[in-house]
């Protein structure tokens, strides 16, 4: 149970691929102009990570070490192609918005890295959990950044959610404030870098506060030989 908890905590927070490892920055910065786009790409990446880790772990005993990386890339490319066709079939608007960044998941360092570092050494279900946790950690970072940029840039939240979730999701659109002209800095790549920097700073502050709290609540160590002395 402790191993499962550690995998989840590492993926979601301590070893977050976007906020700690800083992997996959190209799609993270390019696609997160809206919360819907960020959520769509994040969920697609999570699905790819989960299925890839599961497949790599299942086949690890029959994968020659000398050619393991090309085999991993072939597995990842197959999974990404399947996910791309699913998005094209059931969320065409999102497919058009994400564009080239769906097939680029194949080259994402997160996916290849987890296949090599974790899935090739652990069992299928733990590997699938690792992929899901890492993917949801990245999705959370994308969603927060996308929401921040959309609110500051357009004054809305979940604009275009129907392209991801269907026609009923139009009711999710919220207008935070009205603006006649968008705040371009938030919508362009410089705004994405600034937003990511703020998120990194907030995570650092939270981690530091948690360290101080643990240090304050930790019982003070008793030096050897002092036990029993008055």
Swiss-Prot record:
Taxonomic superkingdom: Bacteria
Localization of this protein: Cell inner membrane
Keywords in alphabetical order: Cell inner membrane, Cell membrane, Electron transport, Membrane, Translocase, Transmembrane, Transmembrane helix, Transport
Keyword Heme: no
Residue ranges crossing the lipid bilayer per the database entry: 22-42, 63-83, 86-106, 125-145, 182-202
EC category: translocase
Subunit composition and interactions: The complex is composed of six subunits: RsxA, RsxB, RsxC, RsxD, RsxE and RsxG.
Official protein name in the record: Ion-translocating oxidoreductase complex subunit E
Native source organism of the sequence: Salmonella paratyphi A (strain AKU_12601)
Gene designation per UniProt: rsxE
């Amino acid at each position: 149970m402790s191993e499962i908890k550690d995998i989840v905590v590492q993926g979601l927070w301590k070893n977050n691929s976007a906020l700690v490892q800083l992997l996959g920055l190209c799609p993270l910065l390019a696609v997160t102009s809206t919360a819907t786009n960020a959520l769509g790409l994040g969920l697609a990446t999570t699905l790819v990570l989960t299925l890839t880790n599961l497949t790599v772990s299942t086949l690890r005993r029959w994968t020659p070490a000398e050619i393991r990386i090309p085999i991993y890339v072939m597995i990842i490319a197959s999974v990404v192609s399947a996910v791309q066709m699913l998005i094209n079939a059931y969320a065409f608007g999102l497919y058009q918005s994400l564009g080239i960044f769906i097939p680029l998941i194949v080259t994402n360092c997160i996916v290849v890295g987890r296949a090599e570092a974790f899935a090739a050494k652990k069992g299928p279900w733990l590997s699938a959990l690792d992929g899901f946790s890492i993917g949801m950690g990245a999705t959370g970072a994308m969603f927060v950044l996308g929401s921040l940029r959309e609110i500051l840039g357009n004054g809305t939240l979940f604009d275009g959610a129907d392209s991801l979730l269907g026609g009923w999701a139009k009711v999710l659109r919220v207008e935070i404030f009205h603006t006649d002209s968008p705040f371009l800095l938030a919508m362009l790549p410089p705004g994405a870098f600034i937003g990511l920097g703020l998120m990194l700073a907030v995570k650092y502050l939270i981690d530091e506060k948690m360290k101080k709290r643990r240090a304050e609540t930790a019982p003070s160590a008793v030096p050897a030989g002092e036990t029993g002395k008055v």
